[in-house]
Amino acid sequence: MIPLRVRVPASTANVGPGFDSVGIALSLYLEVSVKEEADKWQVIHSFDDSIPKDDKNLIVSTACKVCPSLSPHIIEVTSNIPLTRGLGSSASAIVAGIELANQLGNLYLTTDQKVQIATNFEGHPDNVAASILGGTVIGALDGKNVSVVRIESKELGVISLIPNEELNTDESRSVLPEMFPFHEAVKASAISNVLVAALCQKKWEVVGEMMERDHFHEPYRLELVPLLPSIRKCAKEFGAYGTALSGAGPSIFILTPYEKRKEIADQLARVFAAMKVCELEIDHKGITVNKEEHIGL
């Protein structure tokens, strides 16, 4: 068979008030290399024992749901995306599984179909659409219909502060209210609208202001990520546009002028030495496939 390698970027979601809607692809990657066919699925990886090495692996189980007739293969998975840190590790695995099915099953899926399938698995389009399309995405899931718009943000630099502690998405969602007062929803929605407009018009100072004024989720998650206010204050003093939780946390996501990202990252690393400070870039390619013939790309 033709050697096949699937590469999927990490992602950050929400960007403050764009809850379950806005996502940005990041320069951390999950890679899946497909080896030979086998009697049963085998996943070679160096992660801990909590990550399955058989057909229960999220990549494989997703692929088999998309294409139940898929022949088992041996695959090797590598990733520098931290697990359960709010950087889209599960979304990248889902996207990789869909592309694995697309390639091995000769499905010829369009990009829109991949986004639709991935959103159905994930429940919201922000992370998965960013990983598929690259760049910055704004998406909405209305019933079964997914709408996504992609925009370029090449002028932006990204810094991620990653703590040692894990935070499960279900735990982080459990602190959110089941009901939201109407007046709060109006206020939160207006801020989100301005965030999206500012992203589209490249008004980065406004983007930074809006991403720090979320009402949908961050006020409720502060108890789980108590360092957010102090990181936000320091980042602004060092020249960043804005700071927000990365997805459900616990990682912190900071937007900066592209040319200042290293300087700001170095300053933050000195202040918050207990956290891993990563100077990243926005990934503008999205999912890529290394193969002589690309299918559905």
From Swiss-Prot:
Primary localization class, coarse: cytoplasm
Subcellular location, record wording: Cytoplasm
GO terms, biological process: threonine biosynthetic process
Catalytic activity reported: L-homoserine + ATP = O-phospho-L-homoserine + ADP + H(+)
Record's keyword terms, sorted: Amino-acid biosynthesis, ATP-binding, Cytoplasm, Kinase, Nucleotide-binding, Threonine biosynthesis, Transferase
EC number(s) reported in the record: 2.7.1.39
Family according to the record: Belongs to the GHMP kinase family. Homoserine kinase subfamily.
Record PANTHER family: HOMOSERINE KINASE, HOMOSERINE/4-DIPHOSPHOCYTIDYL-2-C-METHYL-D-ERYTHRITOL KINASE
Name the UniProt record assigns to this protein: Homoserine kinase
This protein's encoding gene: thrB
